[in-house]
């Protein structure tokens, strides 16, 4: 204590009580007069000097003065003090002030905008003037101060020092205690609020609050320059208790008589309270001393608050939102001075120091000279004592009164100075206390200098809460006052909260920690029943949650339950105003353990940088979330309800958005251990009172080890690289993540049986694998302030989705090119990458997710459950979104994006095993698919709503890198089979050659979807690179199993999709380097084959495969365009899955033994669904060129591959096994009864070519009859003509053509075997009939009666079977073209086949139909009573098959040798089969109809070429075109039609009907070519030839099908009937040598090689048969019929092939013509001379041709002999012998006429003379000139004599041959054409004709 007690005694004795009151009143009036309203009455003042107390009572506060001084956004409306007691320090340690019943009423400062703006402008102008004046004064006073400091020293008066010490001690020992503090806040929202009812007022009540200032003393050894008088820090302590925050409903008629504390409880809404009716706390505030003054740059504060309870209800939330809106709307009017003060403070023109000096007459002593540079930041106190002094003062006597007055004058001057320098408002009152302490300290130390106003540097504050409880009611208090009302609320409990923040000049750092947290859902019932069951229901819920937790793996927060039991239960029951019930508690969130919640926040103001930068980090403790979406829904509804009452305008929203965008934000959240449990169904558990507890849960587990600070500093979020321009971002870091599906064992019928003990099972369906433990999965949210509006992004995305750029590249490349531009793939990759970046940068918000390697495990049951739960959650979200959308107004459309990156993903699904799989499909790989495993790398996902800020433009992008799909079957559960691979090794594979220019850089898949607004178009594009699909064991049913697993059936959704077809769509599927591999799996099929049988695998590879579709609006028709570039087929023998190992590169395929056997450069097709012609689907392909290249072994491999696929794709015979055997037995019994084998009867025919019907005689027999009894053998006639014109033509050449019935066309008719009129005999039919006569009209009136029934033959009586002698005349009706489905086998009198397939008469029946098979008619709609539902149409297909000698596979391949070192094929020996203009049609018909399918095949031209280097000629097989066999340009060389019918639709038996027609064939065969064909097809390179089931013939071996023994032949295709129409064949055979050894050994076929065979013309008869099993039997029947007919009827045609016989036959025919022509001419027109002339000319021409032909052959033979002799004798180097051939074939370049022949003859003679001269002169002369000598030259002459002698003879022979060939070509142009086509080929011959 500074003063002793005697001072108080002397003061009491010196002054009287009245004087003391007067003095105290004077002092209080002087210092507190402005704070107190009115004058102080002496009756209100009580002074006890002995006790040291001064007391005032009933004081009113001058609110106007305070409001003017504070200048705050809040104003004090009224205030009062019940009692003010001041205790002097002589009985207490320091000065104490006690205030009782302090009441303040606050209100917002609500000035009008106009007045505020005027005042602001006036204040600004006034302050600017004052500021300028102050600057001028400051300059003048600075000069005076500098002069005074230099001239004299200053000494502070001792009296002032004494007063300063007293004041300093008083201020540092000041204590204030306030009891019963009430602060009310009346927001005064306006008239509308007051008119609506009571006005809520926010009230803060405190029982007691105490504030004191003290000094922290330090020891002597700790005294430093920063300490002052041993004082280290100035401490300020504030303590309060009993604090309560509440809302009072104040009425307008309330006055001062009705104070706040007199309100009833019904008018009070409690907001914040504590355990004992209020909360308490303390605030410790300290400031350090530095250089004798307070260092306010560093302030430390420590706040501690006891447990607090915060309560909210809708009305209070609504009130606070309205309050916030009011403050924000008037914020600009509340801070005009603050903004101006900041302006002045920041102004650079303000001087840093303002110095003032006392008058110059002042006498200072003891002072020291001050230098400017040593005290730059100090200020003098101006005018701190008056200018005149008394003598006593000059003598040093202390005048205390004068010293007091002088001190307070200095204090007022200091306050005035600070007010003038800009310190105004609330801070002026706060900082003046510290400034006064500084002033007192300076004066007490004898210093006249005051420190300048210090800038704040750092403030440290620590706030700790023992606990915080938050209660949120979903209803207002007025709604649950009734006893029976149910109360529903949420309670949150937070324990041990510690928050510390550090405020610097431009930065703010906030750190906090929360030890534990619990959030629960409470529901308290109002009736007695609910109250009685509440406790048991709470236990049931806890038991349920405990069982769910037990079913899950151990979690880090499993020990939190013990902590939660210790949490306070104040939020459950104790706080309620009525304690009549117990609330049912449902735990929602519990977080405890570890280091708790830890968060750090850093704020950097915009003054420190160009843009303020804020950051925060949050670390979560082990947390468990029980997410009940019903509670979330209630929260959302509460928010919507509250927001309705306080709508936010768009202007306010824009202001908030603009203010929030001024600073950047970076946040990071680290989730170490968290468990989220989603509760299903979405109902409030507490409201339902556990009648039906949750049965299904989705649990998400997140766990990771928190990274260290160094690792966190080094880490950079991957999202920041994708979104560098983001101004605000929040990143969540997660380590390992797992998702579980938890289900109960309750059945649906036991749902409400909650009393039963329920057990739960957890299934891990998703988890991440953090192998390194250093990497974390991240979830980032990024915001951008001003994203660029880019509507052009929609067009860019449309280009990507439609792949327009790649299509344009293909078009620019031109048709027929195998490869496109090389730069296209790289450019496309660049476009994808650039577009992805542009889309991300144009987003205002981006959610980025980066996942570690992810694994998903699901079975079908789990997936269905998960889909149901997700669907329920989606419905909930859509409902909530709809409710929220109704409350919100439209805002600006902004683009947002979701980006997901995953390092790898592993999806394992287990579908249910399927039953009823085809047994044939399981031939190689038995079992059902039970598991699929999909593994992909680098998964990227992007979802962008409102792309380019265009409303409704949604874009989705999914991409991944390499990947594989593995599968397992029940037969091999432990073995995974590769089903699909997407590998970089397959890049550039193309068609297997490894040179695909369309390849991309990396393998992968891209899935793009764009929904374009406005026109409502959907664009979908799927692109895959390096993809190979595997059909292990020939099974591709895994595609259906996999897709059906993920197809979640929803009938309503399907109906909605089907009904919403009003929008157009576009779909593109594009594959690059795609392949389809068939890999036989023969591990378990050894019993089906012998060990020596090899297996063949194949791979169909393509450089590019694209499928595109565009759907029109309101159209069900879809057209899919298919485009395949560079297609190849590769084969491999003895295939083993271990060879490939999942690698399908071209190099590895070649090493594994794959050989390319077929390729096609371009294939274009169209697949139509729901087409206009009534077809469900239709596939059309045109203009394709297929090239097949094989050797003998690969050809056998193709055959074996077809056999393997046939066994896999064969129909299931289990259902039809009994019917197959019954059909076989019926036919065999019928054959036995008739004692006639079917094959013998089919081969019978008469000499005229008529065919007899195959009928089974059964007149007197009963029983089972053959199925073919009722088949009319002429039912398959191609064309008929009702009228026949006679002409004298040979019978063997009579047939009818489809177009004009001309010779040479395919036969479209069947010769009638019934009795025909004489004018319709076959032999007398015309060979040339006009096309008009061939047109047949089918009139409606002429239709016979149609029987629409069909009876199986075994159930029909024998009387109905037609008899053999039934010869009733019948009309011939034409059948439609190959695509028509109309067909009928009926007669006017009797119906032979009575089937339901006869069509009704249609409009087309009135039109004429010509059965010509033209291309124009091929492919038209089928007009049948039952239309086809599917169709495959191939048009203008070109096929080339090249067969080479050699082998593609080495013979020692089984020894493990590398296929890379095989010998390979010999390309010098090659035959090529060319089919051009191929038309193919296949139609399917609906199930239940008689006709099941129809196949039609037509070939425009077919040729067989010899492409060998030593080929004797080019054309081997072709069309026989001659004057006797003319051909129409539109006719086809080959026609085939195959129909599959089902006589009984209810019986699964199909029977085939076949008909084939051929144009005349020309065969030029050389012996070498025949040997090549025999060696190629006769010797199978594979170990054992495939024995076709059709080759078994009459085998009686049986197989077992479903326990039934069935003959193997009965399983073969059954041909109800087939027709092979007559065909003419012209054969030329040139032998090369005769195998004498084989001939002598009995091989008499060598006799054919003795002589050449020329011009053999054979007419192969029409073959008609019925009831044949197998293709092998069909071929045997056809060949047998033909051989028998040729051997019996056309042996003379073979003899004509001998050249001598042919010449004699020609001379005989010419001589006969010479005699018969005059006779015929005379008989016809009585002109004999003309006939003689014709006969003579014909005779002479025939003799000339034979003579010339003989000469040609002789000359050619002589030339060949002489040429060989010339090569033998030639020794000159100038005449080398050819390596492959011994002669030049002159026939390849034969003269076209006699003139050209003579020219070539002259050239030949000249060449011969030149050779002679060269041998005798030129060659010896060259040797002589080189210096060989005369002897050597003479020897050369002797050696050249034979050559010189033979060369002219050889040249003459060649000249004669050329001349004769020219003459023959002039006389016989037809032979010339045939010869040129033979040696040059048809194509080259046509080109030469065009050039000439």
From Swiss-Prot:
InterPro entries: ATG2 (IPR026849). Disruption phenotype: Early senescence phenotype. Defects in autophagosome formation. Enhanced resistance to powdery mildew (Golovinomyces cichoracearum) and mildew-induced cell death. Constitutive expression of defense-related genes. Increased number of peroxisomes and accumulation of peroxisomal proteins. Reduced sensitivity to programmed cell death (PCD) induced by both hydroxyurea and the bacterial avirulent factor avrRpm1. It comes from the Eukaryota. GO terms for cellular component: endoplasmic reticulum membrane; phagophore assembly site membrane. It is found in: Preautophagosomal structure membrane; Endoplasmic reticulum membrane. Residues 21-129 form the Chorein N-terminal domain. Residues 1357-1376, 1866-1892 are annotated as: Disordered. Belongs to the ATG2 family. This is Autophagy-related protein 2. It comes from Arabidopsis thaliana. The gene is ATG2.
């Amino acid at each position: 204590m500074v003063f002793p007690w005697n001072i108080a005694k002397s003061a009491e004795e010196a002054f009287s009580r009245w004087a003391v009151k007067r003095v105290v009143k004077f002092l209080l009036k002087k210092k507190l007069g402005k704070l107190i309203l009115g004058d102080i009455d002496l009756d209100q003042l009580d002074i006890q000097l002995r006790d040291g107390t001064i007391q005032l009572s009933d004081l009113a506060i001058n609110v106007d003065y305070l409001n003017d001084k504070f200048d705050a956004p809040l104003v004090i409306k009224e205030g009062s003090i019940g009692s003010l007691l001041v205790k002097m320090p002589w009985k207490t340690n320091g000065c104490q002030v006690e205030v009782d019943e302090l009441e303040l009423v606050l209100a917002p400062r609500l000035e009008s905008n106009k007045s505020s703006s005027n005042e602001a402008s006036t204040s600004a102008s006034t302050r600017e003037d004052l500021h300028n004046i102050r600057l001028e004064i400051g300059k003048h006073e600075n000069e005076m101060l500098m002069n005074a400091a230099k001239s004299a020293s200053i000494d502070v008066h001792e009296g002032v020092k004494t007063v300063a010490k007293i004041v300093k001690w008083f201020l540092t020992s000041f204590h204030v205690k306030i009891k019963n503090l009430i602060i009310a806040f009346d927001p005064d929202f306006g008239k509308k609020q007051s008119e609506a009812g009571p006005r809520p007022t926010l009230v803060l009540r405190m029982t007691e609050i105490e504030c004191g200032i003290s000094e922290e003393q330090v020891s002597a050894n700790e005294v430093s320059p920063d300490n002052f008088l041993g004082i280290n820090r100035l401490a300020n302590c504030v303590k309060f208790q009993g604090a309560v925050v509440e809302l009072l409903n104040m009425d307008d008629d309330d006055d001062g008589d009705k104070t706040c504390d007199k309100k009833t409880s019904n008018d009070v809404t409690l907001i914040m309270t504590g355990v004992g009716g209020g909360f308490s706390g303390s605030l410790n505030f300290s400031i350090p001393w530095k250089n004798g003054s307070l260092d306010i740059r560093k302030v430390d504060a420590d706040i501690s608050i006891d447990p607090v309870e915060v309560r909210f209800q809708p009305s209070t939330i609504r009130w606070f939102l309205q309050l916030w809106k009011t403050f924000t709307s008037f914020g600009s009017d509340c801070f005009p001075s603050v903004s101006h003060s900041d302006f002045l403070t920041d102004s650079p023109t303000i001087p840093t120091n303002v110095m003032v000096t006392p008058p110059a007459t002042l006498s200072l002593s003891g002072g020291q000279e001050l230098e400017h540079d040593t005290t730059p930041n100090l200020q003098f106190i101006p005018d701190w004592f008056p200018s005149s002094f008394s003598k006593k003062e000059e003598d040093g006597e202390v005048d205390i009164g004068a010293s007091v007055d002088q001190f307070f004058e200095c204090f007022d001057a200091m306050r005035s100075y600070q007010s003038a320098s800009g310190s105004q408002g609330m801070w002026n009152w706060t900082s003046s206390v510290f400034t006064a302490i500084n002033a007192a300290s300076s004066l007490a130390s004898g210093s006249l200098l005051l420190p300048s106003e210090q800038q704040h540097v750092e403030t440290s504050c620590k706030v700790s809460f023992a606990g915080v409880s938050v209660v949120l009611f979903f209803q207002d208090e007025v709604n649950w006052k009734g006893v029976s009302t149910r109360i529903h609320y949420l309670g949150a409990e937070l324990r041990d909260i510690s928050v510390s923040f550090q405020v610097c000049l431009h930065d703010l750092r906030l750190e906090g920690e929360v030890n534990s947290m619990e959030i629960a859902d409470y529901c308290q019932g109002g009736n007695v029943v609910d109250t009685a069951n509440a406790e048991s229901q709470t236990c049931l819920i806890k038991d349920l949650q405990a069982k769910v937790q037990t079913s899950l793996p151990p979690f880090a927060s499993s020990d939190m339950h013990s902590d939660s039991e210790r949490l306070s239960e104040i939020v459950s029951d104790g706080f309620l105003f009525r304690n009549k019930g117990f609330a049912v508690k449902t735990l929602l969130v519990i977080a405890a353990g570890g280091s708790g919640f830890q968060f750090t926040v850093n704020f950097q103001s915009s003054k420190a940088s160009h843009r303020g930068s804020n950051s925060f980090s949050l670390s979560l403790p082990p947390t468990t979330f029980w997410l009940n979406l019903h509670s979330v829904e209630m929260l959302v509804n509460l928010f919507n309800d509250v927001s309705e009452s306080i709508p936010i305008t768009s202007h306010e929203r824009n202001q908030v958005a603009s203010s929030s965008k001024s600073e950047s934000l970076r946040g990071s959240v680290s989730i170490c251990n968290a468990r989220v449990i989603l509760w299903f169904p979405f109902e409030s558990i507490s409201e339902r009172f556990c009648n039906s507890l949750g049965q299904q849960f989705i649990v998400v587990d997140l766990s990771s080890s928190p990274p260290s600070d160094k690792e966190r500093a080094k880490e950079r979020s991957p999202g920041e690289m994708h979104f560098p321009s983001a101004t605000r971002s929040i990143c969540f870091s997660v380590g390992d993540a797992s998702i579980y599906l938890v289900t109960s064992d309750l059945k649906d019928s036991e749902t409400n049986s909650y009393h039963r003990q329920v057990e739960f099972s957890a299934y891990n369906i998703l988890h991440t694998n953090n192998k390194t433990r250093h990497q974390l999965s991240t979830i980032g949210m990024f915001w951008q302030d001003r994203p660029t509006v880019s509507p052009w992004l929609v067009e860019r995305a449309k280009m990507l989705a439609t792949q327009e750029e790649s299509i344009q590249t293909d078009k620019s490349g031109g048709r027929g090119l195998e490869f496109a531009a090389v730069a296209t793939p790289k450019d496309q990759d660049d476009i994808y990458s650039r577009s992805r970046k542009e889309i991300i940068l144009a987003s205002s918000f981006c959610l980025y997710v980066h996942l570690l390697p992810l694994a998903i495990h699901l079975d079908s049951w789990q997936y269905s459950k998960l889909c149901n739960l997700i669907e329920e959650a989606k419905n909930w979200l859509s409902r909530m979104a709809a409710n929220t959308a109704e409350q919100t107004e439209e805002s600006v459309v902004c683009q947002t994006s979701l980006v997901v990156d995953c390092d790898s993903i592993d999806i394992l699904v287990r579908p249910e095993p399927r039953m009823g799989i085809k047994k044939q499909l399981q031939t190689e790989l038995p079992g059902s698919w039970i598991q699929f495993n999909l593994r992909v790398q680098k998964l990227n996902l992007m979802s962008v709503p409102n792309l380019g800020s265009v409303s409704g433009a949604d874009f989705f992008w999914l991409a991944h890198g390499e990947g594989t799909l593995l599968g397992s079957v029940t037969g091999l559960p432990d073995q995974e089979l590769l089903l699909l691979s997407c590998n970089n090794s397959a890049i550039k594979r193309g068609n297997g050659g490894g040179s695909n220019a369309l390849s991309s850089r990396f393998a992968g898949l891209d899935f793009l979807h764009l929904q374009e607004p406005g026109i409502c178009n959907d664009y979908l594009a799927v692109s895959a690179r390096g993809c190979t699909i595997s059909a292990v064991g020939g099974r591709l049913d895994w595609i259906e199993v996999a897709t059906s697993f993920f197809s979640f059936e929803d009938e309503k959704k399907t109906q909605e999709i089907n009904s919403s077809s009003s929008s157009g769509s576009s779909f593109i599927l594009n594959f690059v380097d795609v392949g389809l591999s068939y890999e036989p799996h023969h591990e378990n099929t050894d019993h089906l084959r012998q060990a020596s049988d090899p297996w063949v695998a194949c791979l169909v590879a393509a450089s590019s495969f694209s499928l595109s579709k565009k759907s029109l609006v309101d159209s069900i028709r879809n057209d899919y365009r298919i485009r395949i570039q560079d297609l190849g087929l590769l084969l491999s023998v003895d295939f083993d899955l271990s060879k490939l190992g999942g690698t399908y590169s071209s190099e590895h395929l070649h090493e594994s033994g794959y050989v390319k056997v077929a390729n096609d450069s371009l294939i274009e097709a169209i697949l139509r669904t729901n087409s206009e012609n009534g077809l469900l689907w239709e596939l059309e392909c045109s203009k394709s060129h297929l090239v097949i290249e094989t050797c003998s072994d690969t050809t056998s491999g193709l055959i074996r591959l077809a056999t393997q696929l046939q066994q896999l794709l064969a129909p299931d015979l289990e259902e039809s096994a009994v019917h197959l055997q019954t059909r076989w037995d019926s036919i065999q019994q019928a054959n036995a009864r008739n004692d006639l084998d079917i094959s013998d009867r089919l081969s019978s025919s008469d000499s005229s070519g008529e065919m007899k019907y195959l009928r089974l005689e059964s007149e007197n027999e009963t029983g089972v009859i053959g199925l073919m009894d009722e088949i009319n053998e002429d039912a398959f006639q191609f064309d008929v003509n009702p009228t026949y014109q006679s002409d004298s033509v040979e019978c063997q050449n009579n047939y009818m053509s489809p177009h004009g019935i001309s010779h040479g066309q395919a036969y479209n008719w069947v010769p009638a075997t019934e009795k025909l009129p004489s004018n319709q005999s076959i032999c007398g039919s015309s060979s040339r009939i006009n096309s008009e006569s061939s047109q047949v009209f089918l009139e409606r009136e002429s239709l016979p009666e149609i029987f629409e029934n069909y009876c199986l033959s075994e159930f029909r009586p024998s009387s109905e079977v037609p008899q053999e002698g039934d010869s009733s005349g019948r009309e011939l009706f034409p059948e439609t073209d190959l695509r028509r489905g109309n067909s009928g086998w009926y007669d006017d009198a009797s119906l032979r086949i009575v089937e339901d397939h006869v069509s009704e008469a249609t409009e087309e029946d009135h039109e004429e139909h010509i059965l010509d098979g033209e291309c124009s008619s091929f492919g038209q709609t089928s007009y049948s009573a039952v239309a086809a539902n599917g169709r495959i149409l191939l048009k203008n297909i070109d096929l080339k098959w090249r067969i080479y000698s050699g082998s593609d596979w080495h013979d020692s391949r089984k020894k493990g040798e590398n296929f890379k070192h095989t010998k390979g094929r010999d390309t010098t020996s090659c035959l090529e089969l060319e089919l051009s203009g191929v038309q193919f049609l296949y139609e399917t018909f609906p199930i239940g109809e008689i006709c099941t399918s129809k196949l039609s095949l037509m070939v425009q031209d077919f040729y067989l070429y010899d492409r060998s280097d030593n080929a004797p000629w080019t054309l081997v097989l072709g069309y026989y075109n001659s004057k006797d066999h003319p051909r129409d340009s539109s006719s086809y060389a080959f026609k085939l039609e195959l129909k599959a019918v089902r006589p009984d639709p209810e019986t699964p038996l199909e029977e085939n009907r076949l008909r084939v027609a051929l144009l005349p064939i020309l065969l030029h065969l050389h012996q070498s070519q025949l040997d090549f064909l025999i060696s190629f097809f006769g010797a199978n390179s594979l170990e054992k030839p495939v024995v076709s089931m059709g080759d078994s013939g009459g085998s009686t071996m049986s197989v077992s099908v479903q326990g039934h023994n069935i003959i193997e032949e009965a399983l073969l295709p059954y041909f109800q009937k087939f027709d092979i129409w007559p065909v003419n064949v012209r054969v030329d055979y040139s032998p090369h040598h005769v195998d004498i050894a084989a001939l002598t050994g009995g091989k008499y076929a060598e006799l054919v090689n003795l002589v050449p065979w020329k011009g053999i013309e054979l007419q192969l008869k029409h073959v008609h048969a019925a009831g044949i099993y197998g293709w092998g039997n069909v071929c045997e029947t056809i060949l047998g019929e033909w051989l028998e007919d040729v051997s019996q009827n056309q042996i003379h045609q073979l003899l004509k092939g001998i050249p001598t016989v042919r010449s004699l036959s020609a001379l005989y025919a010419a001589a006969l013509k010479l005699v018969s022509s005059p006779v015929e001419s005379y008989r016809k027109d009585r002109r004999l001379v003309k006939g003689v002339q014709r006969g003579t000319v014909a005779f002479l021409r025939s003799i000339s041709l034979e003579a010339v032909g003989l000469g040609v052959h002789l000359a050619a033979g002589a030339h060949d002999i002489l040429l060989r002799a010339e090569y033998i004798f030639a020794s000159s180097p100038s005449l080398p012998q050819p390596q492959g051939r011994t002669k030049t074939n002159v026939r390849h370049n034969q003269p076209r006429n006699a003139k050209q022949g003579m020219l070539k003859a002259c050239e030949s003679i000249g060449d011969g003379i030149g050779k002679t001269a060269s041998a005798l002169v030129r060659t010896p002369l060259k040797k002589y000139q080189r210096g060989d000598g005369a002897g050597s030259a003479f020897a050369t002459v002797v050696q050249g004599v034979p050559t010189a002698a033979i060369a002219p003879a050889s040249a003459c022979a060649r000249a004669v041959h050329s001349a004769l060939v020219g003459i023959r070509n002039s006389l016989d142009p037809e032979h010339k054409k045939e010869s040129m086509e033979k040696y040059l080929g048809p194509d080259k011959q046509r080109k030469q004709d065009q050039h000439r």
